[in-house]
Amino acid sequence: MYETYHSGWIECITGSMFSGKSEELIRRLRRGLYAKQKVVVFKPAIDDRYHKDKIVSHNGNAIEAINISTAAEILKHDLSEVDVIGIDEVQFFENGIVHIAEQLAEKGHRVITAGLDMDFRAQPFEPMPQLMAVSEDVTKLQAVCAVCGASSSRTQRLIDGNPAKIDDPVILVGANESYEPRCRAHHIVAPSNTEKEEM
């Protein structure tokens, strides 16, 4: 990624669950720290899987983070001396996160975001599509399909070992007890109970 002088930019790391998004975010943030840059990291309060005040990858790597409930809370922090701003699990924030990321970049910050691009139904997971569109750099990572070992771009939600239904709630915070990576061929979304009754 080239540096733009006198302005910031947005980097977007995306892909399915278990593709290494948080790992890559942590790696980029640590590089900033090694370069003696001032780094601040934010994460959504809803994501309390591993630690309340840290971003933790599935591999166990971690970095301190500020826990926030809404994207607007980012702007309540003094970021005047900050070089790099990290934001994890962007899909859990409201669409306003896109405008906030743009504002931060326009003020000269390097904004590094990470989040799912698709929900468990393999549908675009807002606000990631919008954020990807306004980012200077987009990295889409692949996981490995839990069924066949092929590259995986989808996240399979499992409820008691069975595929989730299409009308289940979009947000269900979990890790390997509820989700696994799948390729296009092995990704399954069960019909709703209503659809089954109509058949």
Swiss-Prot record:
It catalyses: thymidine + ATP = dTMP + ADP + H(+). Pfam families: TK (PF00265). Its EC number is 2.7.1.21. Signal peptide: none annotated. GO terms for biological process: DNA biosynthetic process; thymidine metabolic process. Keywords: ATP-binding, Cytoplasm, DNA synthesis, Kinase, Metal-binding, Nucleotide-binding, Transferase, Zinc. PROSITE patterns: TK_CELLULAR_TYPE. ATP binds at residues 15-22, 88-91. GO terms for molecular function: ATP binding; thymidine kinase activity; zinc ion binding. The active site is at 89 (proton acceptor). Zn(2+) binds at residues 145, 148, 183, 186. It comes from the Bacteria. The keyword Transferase applies. It is found in: Cytoplasm. The keyword Metal-binding applies. GO terms for cellular component: cytosol. Homotetramer. Belongs to the thymidine kinase family. This is Thymidine kinase. It comes from Staphylococcus saprophyticus subsp. saprophyticus (strain ATCC 15305 / DSM 20229 / NCIMB 8711 / NCTC 7292 / S-41).
